[in-house]
Amino acid sequence: MRALTVLLALMAVSATSNAYYRVCYYTNWAQYRPAGAKFFPEDIDPFLCTHIIYSFAKINQQNMIAMYEWNDDKMYVRFNNLKENNPELKTLLAVGGWNHESGTESPFSRMVRTIATRKVFIDSVKR
């Protein structure tokens, strides 16, 4: 019985020690760094991280998800293409940012105010 308990304990430790998350962060303004320091999605090692977060998207006045940069739509595609080399990679999009809350009303507060405004946001994210 003791051997079975030890075996089960070792199996539990083994199962949990192999599971980890390494979350990395990519900023959309890395493309504007000076020459030699510019950084694009293709420069990311897709096996370095289990999850990579792209920053940022924003919530517009219509409570829809929107791009910050003029080329974010193309950058999202390039970012998600990292999964072609590593299908296990999880890519995520951060909404907000350091100046997203500027103004008299928070875009998040405005968006969550009613079921209808939440639905508009959710539908825009799913597209």
What are the functions of these language-model segments?
Residues 2-19:
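Cleavable N-terminal signal peptides of Sec/SRP-targeted secreted and luminal proteins
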Residues 17-127:
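Glycan-recognition patch characteristic of GH18 chitinases/ENGases
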